[in-house]
Amino acid sequence: MNSNALSLLGLCRKANKLSMGHDMCKGAVTSAKACVCLVSSDSSERVYDEFSSLCGSKNIPIFRIEPTIDEIHHLIGYKAGIITIDDGGFAKSFMKNFKEYRPGEETLYDK
């Protein structure tokens, strides 16, 4: 994963544009506040499947990212296996720096 994308997560945290942890992320997704959902590499398949169906129903992209829960903790200062970016501008910037970025998806983050 691109280091610029990772550093952007810290910036999102400081700007209070991240939801972190299962319950906060579930609320952000169900209220359609989330623009992108990110699941750590060591989170369970059950969590990924749960959020995959939730995000699919709200047309919110979801990605499994390389950092582990501990690495995310080091980046944002909060131990969470799942996070959402809740700002369209930050989501676009993250996706431009994200290794698996797919052209054309930027229209999904105009919330």
Task: Cite the ranges covered by each PLM segment.
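Mid-chain, well-packed structural core segment of small domains
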Residues: 54-80
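C-terminal structural segments of small proteins and small subunits
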Residues: 73-110
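Short, ordered loop/turn segments at secondary-structure junctions
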Residues: 23, 42, 67-70, 88
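Charged, alpha-helix-enriched surfaces in structured cytosolic catalytic cores
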Residues: 4, 46, 67, 89, ...
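Short, flexible, solvent-exposed loop/turn segments with mixed acidic/basic and small polar residues
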Residues: 6, 26-27, 51, 70-75
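N-terminal positively charged helical leader segments and presequences
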Residues: 30, 34-52, 61
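N-terminal first-folded block
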Residues: 4-39
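Conserved catalytic alpha/beta core of Sir2/sirtuin-type deacylases, generalized to analogous enzyme cores
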Residues: 1-3, 15, 103-106
